[in-house]
């Protein structure tokens, strides 16, 4: 599974519970976006970053 380049957030497993209390396995996936970022050495790299890190400004996009 893919993970966030910044915070290493990845898919977690849990249960979906119906009205009659039946439990089925399911996967909670992070909202990952493929973005081109500028690395500290000045180069660019395409990585997967979660939207929470994008909104917080934890990465600098390469334009």
Swiss-Prot record:
GO CC entries: ribonucleoprotein complex; ribosome
Top-rank taxon, per record: Bacteria
Keywords associated with the record: Ribonucleoprotein, Ribosomal protein
Gene Ontology MF annotations: structural constituent of ribosome
Keyword Transcription regulation attributed: no
GO terms, biological process: translation
InterPro entries in alphabetical order: Bacterial_rp_bL28 (IPR050096), Ribosomal_bL28 (IPR026569), Ribosomal_bL28/bL31-like_sf (IPR034704), Ribosomal_bL28_bact-type (IPR001383), Ribosomal_bL28_sf (IPR037147)
Cleaved signal peptide residues: none
Transmembrane segments: none
UniProt similarity note: Belongs to the bacterial ribosomal protein bL28 family.
UniProt protein name: Large ribosomal subunit protein bL28
Lineage, uppermost ranks: Bacteria, Pseudomonadati, Aquificota, Aquificia, Aquificales
